[in-house]
Amino acid sequence: MLDPALLRQHPADLAERLRSTRGFSLDTAELESLESERKRIQVRTQELQSQRNSKSKAIGQAKAKGEDVAALMAEVAGFGDELKASEDALDAIRAKLEGIALGLPNLPAEGVPLGKDESENLEQSRWGTPRQFDFAVKDHVELGAPHGWLDGETAAKLSGARFTVLRGPVARLHRALAQFMLDLHVGEHGYEETNVPLLVNADSMRGTGQLPKFEDDLFQTEVGESRRYLIPTSEVPLTNIVREEIVDAERLPLRMTAHSMCFRAEAGSGGRDTRGMIRQHQFEKVELVTACAPEDSDAEHQRMTRCAEVVLEQLGLPYRKVLLCTGDMGFSAIKTYDLEVWLPSQNTYREISSCSNCGDFQARRMQARWRNPVSGKPELLHTLNGSGTAVGRAMIAVMENYQNADGSIDVPQVLRPYMGGIERIG
């Protein structure tokens, strides 16, 4: 959530910044009308509260003197009805204003390129040279499906489209990748392994920015009066660990990692990436989350992105690093780097990691704070999140980049200890 002071004091300036950087249209006329109405109702509510308190005090004094208080009691009762109506009206208009505030995207950091979509992202660097094959390259489906290792048909029978059953050595490769990533981030990068719930409440989804804007892309479940959401990323539970907390400065930065299932409805994906495992309703990811002091978030962003890069480098997978433009950034981010891995079958780079600095945007929604030792006062944290990396896409990249002419797949050196020493699949 953006600073409410921006909405109240500079709505026109904020609207222009949102329009020019995010392509977002803020109705300032509606906002100013609601804010004016809020002030009017709030003043009247405070007047009624003051009158009620004054009359209540007078009742106490009259009772102490043994005087008849019936008339005063009747006045207070009248105030009570009007006060309740005024308080309800104030709550309703505050809810409308909060709804507007919750729907506003974050403002990009200085230096983020202006642009309308991914075509205007800026490539920062490349690592590795895509392999030149002397045979016809197969995609991950052609490599896995003939052996039954990758089975979309059975998954469709069980669950519908955009699910996959993995078997045998490919299922083991998938598991090995997740274990390798976790061990790397915990053992070498200093993240704390954390096992988190896959079902979270609405407050958690609001805290990280999935609600209310992206509800259509979420799976949810209701039991009785209890509603829970399946997480689209473990960023949600990891980041919400600091919700409504005041963290001591000595504990910062908090660096957490989790391997989890992720669930996405892919409501806006249409017919994109329907083949294989590129875009699934259920997939696995190793997530990185950091909460830190504001002055450290830029450095933590660079560090987090580098941690994700190391995963790909140790796997020997060519990739490129891209700085996202304003039109391609996520809702909560002020700055985002994407890592895109080379897929030979598509002859292009595809996203495998996205690392974002969210500034104080999520922290304000969550009331996640730290105690500044200089001022001694609680201040908003900065939060960051990144994929370290998507497990399914890493498996696809390994299968395709390490394939042989006979359809077998070499196992990258760093994964062999997790594969029982197996050097080749197939």
Curated annotation (Swiss-Prot):
Catalyzes the attachment of serine to tRNA(Ser). Is also able to aminoacylate tRNA(Sec) with serine, to form the misacylated tRNA L-seryl-tRNA(Sec), which will be further converted into selenocysteinyl-tRNA(Sec). It is found in: Cytoplasm. One of its GO terms (biological process) is selenocysteine biosynthetic process. GO terms for cellular component: cytoplasm. Homodimer. The tRNA molecule binds across the dimer. One of its GO terms (molecular function) is serine-tRNA ligase activity. Consists of two distinct domains, a catalytic core and a N-terminal extension that is involved in tRNA binding. Pfam families: Seryl_tRNA_N, tRNA-synt_2b. ATP binds at R264, A265, E266, E351, I352, S353, S354. Its main location: cytoplasm. It catalyses: tRNA(Ser) + L-serine + ATP = L-seryl-tRNA(Ser) + AMP + diphosphate + H(+); tRNA(Sec) + L-serine + ATP = L-seryl-tRNA(Sec) + AMP + diphosphate + H(+). This is Serine--tRNA ligase. Keywords: Aminoacyl-tRNA synthetase, ATP-binding, Cytoplasm, Ligase, Nucleotide-binding, Protein biosynthesis. Pathway: Aminoacyl-tRNA biosynthesis; selenocysteinyl-tRNA(Sec) biosynthesis; L-seryl-tRNA(Sec) from L-serine and tRNA(Sec): step 1/1. L-serine binds at T233, S234, E235, E287, S387. Belongs to the class-II aminoacyl-tRNA synthetase family. Type-1 seryl-tRNA synthetase subfamily. Its EC number is 6.1.1.11. It comes from the Bacteria. It comes from Xanthomonas axonopodis pv. citri (strain 306).
